[in-house]
């Protein structure tokens, strides 16, 4: 297995981590960089925003913008997994903001196709077995 930290190793916010195994890719989080970040980098990544997407998936750990803020850039054919409660909370937020922020409407559209999971219940994607574990991170049911 290969683990690649595309962004987030030297900064807070905007994290994107990729796990690769036998041609499969599991990306974890695709967030916005925090305001005041010295260099804004829009990520255009093989297997996530371009190229062969057939063996790729995205897992969102929780609904903070620095973890979920760019999922509207992910093509619809890539499955997005996210905790059920987090999906519902972000849908409410995006629904309220969509009239003043077009990006929120795009986030909402992408969330409508998200695949919910429950903490403590394992699920699989390709060769990856994922066991969401609850952790406290200033939102209810953040997972790692």
Locate each region found by the language model.
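Divalent metal-coordination and catalytic microenvironments
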Residues: 3, 19, 29, 62-63, ...
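Histidine-centered catalytic micro-motifs
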Residues: 58-68, 134-139
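Metal-dependent catalytic neighborhoods of phosphoester/phosphodiester hydrolases
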Residues: 69-77
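Conserved small/polar residues in nucleotide/adenosyl-binding loops
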Residues: 143-144
């Amino acid at each position: 297995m290969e683990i690649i930290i595309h962004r987030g190793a030297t900064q807070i916010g905007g994290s994107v981590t990729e796990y690769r195994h036998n041609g499969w890719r599991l990306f974890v989080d695709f967030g916005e960089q925090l305001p005041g970040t010295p260099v804004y980098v829009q990520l255009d990544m093989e297997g996530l925003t371009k190229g062969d997407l057939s063996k790729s998936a995205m897992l969102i750990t929780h609904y903070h913008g620095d973890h979920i803020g760019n999922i509207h850039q992910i093509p619809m054919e890539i499955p997005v997994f996210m905790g059920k409660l987090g999906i519902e909370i972000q849908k409410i937020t995006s629904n309220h903001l969509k009239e003043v922020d077009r990006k929120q409407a795009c986030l909402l559209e992408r969330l409508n196709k998200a695949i919910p999971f429950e903490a403590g219940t394992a699920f699989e994607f390709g060769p990856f077995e994922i066991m969401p574990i609850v952790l406290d991170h200033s939102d209810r049911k953040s997972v790692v």
